[in-house]
Amino acid sequence: MATKYPKFSRDLAQDPTTRRIWYAIATGNDFESHDGITEENLYQKIFATHFGHVAIIFLWASSLLFHVAWQGNFEQWIKDPLHIRPIAHAIWDPHFGEPAIEAFSQGGANYPVNIAYSGVYHWWYTIGMRTNNDLYQGSIFLLLLAALFLFAGWLHLQPKFRPSLTWFKSAEPRLNHHLAGLFGVSSLAWAGHLIHVAIPESRGVHVGWRNFLTTLPHPAGLTPFWMGNWGVYAENADTTGHIFGTSQGAGTAILTFLGGFHPQTESLWLTDMAHHHLAIAVIFIIAGHMYRTNFGIGHSIKEMLNARQFFGIRTEGQFNLPHQGLYDTYNNSLHFQLSIHLAALGTALSLVAQHMYSLPPYAFIAKDFTTQAALYTHHQYIAGFLMVGAFAHAGIFWVRDYDPEQNQGNVLDRVLKHKEAIISHLSWVSLFLGFHTLGLYVHNDVVVAFGTPEKQILIEPVFAQFIQAAHGKLLYGMDTLLSNPDSIAYTAWPNHANVWLPNWLEAINSGTNSLFLTIGPGDFLVHHAIALGLHTTTLICVKGALDARGTKLMPDKKDFGFTFPCDGPGRGGTCQTSSWEQSFYLALFWMLNLLGWVTFYWHWKHLGVWQGNVAQFNENSTYLMGWFRDYLWANSAQLINGYNPYGTNNLSVWAWMFLFGHLVWATGFMFLISWRGYWQELIETLVWAHERTPLANLVRWKDKPVALSIVQGWLVGLAHFTVGYILTYAAFLIASTAGKFG
């Protein structure tokens, strides 16, 4: 008999029911639970998958370059980036009728195409690419790199090339190599690319494979570097009249600190960014030499964490919190490591979302409004998923990897011991935020509905306005720090030399960009709604992780594993109590809820800025009907009009996705609000009917159909809810923005 799926578990492969498929999917990536796995083998498998992961990323980037070079309009777009729509790729669809072909022949193409809202055109243009040939070369290079990484992944699974467990657990050498090699050297290489290729291209000087060794990036060459006279590289910067991509108004500086934006492209100065990457490289290369490896010099992380002395003063550890035993706990738990890495990456990604629109790095991207909206939403959503993943893996750590003996008295032990205080405080703050914010919104809603809008409770966000004023925003007249020319912030070195401050102040006060947008009562309310979402999601995540080992109701929870369906009614109801259901299922709902509020706010606020009509947001965001009517309903009008009696338009694909997204989302509820007996009856009824229907009964199940467990039903529901939610909002966001701004 042929071996059945899954090969990694003999027990599961022999299960005669459809449970086999479900459990195999559920445990496919849980290498720890597979047959015959050893710790060393586990690390080696994960290590090899990293190469595969990088190969997929290179392949994806290669496909973008290839399709734009083949079917896009990169060379035409460069000539007029503000008015020509960038093309992602052609559409080949045999179902298209004449009206659809006409509607989707856009962006200057004479055949149906998709418009690109990813910002790749702006990125490639900024970093010095100018021709389709450049794109093809990049695509082939990445393809070869992907092949190389796939080979490397395979190679590291061969017996002679498998790293040992001790190699995986040497934290200091890994940290040194990642800091100095991965971050430091790659930042240095990127600074090199910007200085040698991108900056000359922005000044109309083409640097290619033929002349890059003979074209000096700076007229003085390396002399100022060797002489220690580095200021020379900042002299003669591009002027405010510089036309990007030409020599008109161009300077010769390569490393500057101009601050603010290039007036024409409305993006950060390339020379500022080169300076930034060089500085990052220096810092990280130094950081990559701090930890003790072969030579017995440098820091030992274990010694630092176990230390009880801080410059001669007796202490429990950093911030007086004891860290004894943390090194081994962290170094021996892949889930602990993954949890912290996901949390760090999730935070970084959210910061990327916030900075990409407020400090746009790519030329002309600030004026491609649909791309700005798509990139913000995309990065915030991914950040949300990563953060929830962080707490899910924290839950697995507490159940599988945490050793109470080894961590006695340290910070993990302390957090676990006073988890009731942490959870109850989060609960209190969530309740406070929820009731007060909703109370204000509902009050305002009622008085507006009764025709007395002057009775609204409108609160100015004075503390946030103070922070904006401290950064130099003059509008509020607060006269503090950078908005006060006599303050120490204004006059301190190096500002007194007027290095970056004039351009920064001009940018923050311009009113046409997204830097420190003017805020009022509507922002105050939605800020607190977002705070409610953040605190509630955090409450669920933290409770799910800290309660993973046990609670008053179920003190032996850890013995059941990370995910268990139910422990029966005998304990007073233990359904929905595993860390899996709390830190993953429930948290995802609140995470999506929160992201809805965040992206609605960002989008509506920016529609006003882009259309030059901020009054609509300011006046109508202070009550609920304003959000429903003037943001959601008003902006979905064009979307609902994607199909009409007059035929198709270029929003019709988004209109269809909008409808389909709602359908998928609503399907989720069927799986979420249900119980197991219902599914078992349904399955058996379907099988009975199937087996008695001509033709259909020629196909038989090999596995006996068994209903989904409650947890599996929820997973199906959650998947539909999430996918439908994202599809619906993505279609709404892109179509409503593109419909207004082309």
UniProtKB/Swiss-Prot annotation:
InterPro entries: PSI_PsaA/B (IPR001280), PSI_PsaA/B_CS (IPR020586), PSI_PsaA/B_sf (IPR036408), PSI_PsaB (IPR006244). It is found in: Cellular thylakoid membrane. The chain crosses the membrane at residues 46-69, 135-158, 175-199, 273-291, 334-357, 373-399, 421-443, 524-542, 583-604, 651-673, 715-735. Its EC number is 1.97.1.12. [4Fe-4S] cluster binds at residues 566, 575. Chlorophyll a B1 binds at residue 662. GO terms for molecular function: 4 iron, 4 sulfur cluster binding; chlorophyll binding; electron transfer activity; magnesium ion binding; oxidoreductase activity. PSI electron transfer chain: 5 chlorophyll a, 1 chlorophyll a', 2 phylloquinones and 3 4Fe-4S clusters. PSI core antenna: 90 chlorophyll a, 22 carotenoids, 3 phospholipids and 1 galactolipid. P700 is a chlorophyll a/chlorophyll a' dimer, A0 is one or more chlorophyll a, A1 is one or both phylloquinones and FX is a shared 4Fe-4S iron-sulfur center. It catalyses: reduced [plastocyanin] + hnu + oxidized [2Fe-2S]-[ferredoxin] = oxidized [plastocyanin] + reduced [2Fe-2S]-[ferredoxin]. Its main location: membrane. Keywords: 4Fe-4S, Chlorophyll, Chromophore, Electron transport, Iron, Iron-sulfur, Magnesium, Membrane, Metal-binding, Oxidoreductase, Photosynthesis, Photosystem I, Thylakoid, Transmembrane, Transmembrane helix, Transport. PsaA and PsaB bind P700, the primary electron donor of photosystem I (PSI), as well as the electron acceptors A0, A1 and FX. PSI is a plastocyanin/cytochrome c6-ferredoxin oxidoreductase, converting photonic excitation into a charge separation, which transfers an electron from the donor P700 chlorophyll pair to the spectroscopically characterized acceptors A0, A1, FX, FA and FB in turn. Oxidized P700 is reduced on the lumenal side of the thylakoid membrane by plastocyanin or cytochrome c6. Belongs to the PsaA/PsaB family. HAMAP family: PSI_PsaB (MF_00482). NCBIfam families: psaB. This is Photosystem I P700 chlorophyll a apoprotein A2 2. It comes from Trichormus variabilis (strain ATCC 29413 / PCC 7937) (Anabaena variabilis).
